[in-house]
A protein has these predicted regions:
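Bacterial N-terminal signal peptides
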Residues: 9-19
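Extracytoplasmic/periplasmic, Sec-exported soluble proteins
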Residues: 48, 52, 56, 102-104, ...
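Bacterial N-terminal signal peptides that target proteins for export
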Residues: 1-8
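General small-molecule cofactor/ligand-binding pocket signal
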Residues: 72-74
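Surface-exposed short loop/turn segments
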Residues: 27-28, 66-67, 77-128, 132
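C-terminal partner/receptor-binding element of secreted or periplasmic proteins
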Residues: 121-150
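A structural "domain/chain start" motif
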Residues: 3, 18-69, 150
Length: 150
């Protein structure tokens, strides 16, 4: 009987530890830094977005405008950085409930390039992310780039 109680207690402890570990999600998006950018000034905080859909591009533009970046939808020659979606897949899900909702999941990877010397600065791989999580990863990559601002 004591052995059975210990086995049940052990199973309850394992269940408690595994369910409590779900309360602490990962710390955020993983951005891989490849090269450090050459130093730049606040006036050179400009980028263009390439390879994104119109909705994603508008969301990136509004997010970076909050950080005082100038963002355009195509290269005009005045930009310092390029945000390039090397791959972007969008999966659309809708539930069949009384009030139908549509969900989008984004998969792919995005790179930030320094247009002045054509170097890839950082890469953000994302899998089944919401638009908010995707923007958070791009913002984290931009923060890494901003560390070289003088």
């Amino acid at each position: 009987m004591k052995i059975l109680k210990r086995i049940l207690l052990l199973m309850c402890m394992i269940f408690a530890f595994t369910s409590c570990s779900l309360l602490f999600p990962n710390s955020g998006p993983e951005v891989t830094t490849i090269n450090t950018p050459a130093s730049f000034t606040r006036a050179q905080r400009s980028a263009y977005v390439e390879g994104a859909t119109v909705g994603v591009e508008k969301a990136i533009r509004s997010k970076l405008l909050q950080r005082n970046w100038k963002v355009s939808s195509r290269a005009t020659g005045n930009e310092t950085f390029a945000i390039v979606f090397d791959q972007l897949n969008i999966d659309k899900y809708s539930d069949g409930g009384f009030i139908s909702s549509t969900y989008y999941e984004y998969t792919g990877y995005v790179s930030i390039f320094d247009v002045r010397n054509n170097e890839r600065l950082c890469v953000y791989n994302f899998t089944k992310e919401s638009l908010g999580d995707l923007l958070e990863g791009i913002e984290k990559a931009v923060i890494e780039v901003e560390k070289s601002m003088r």
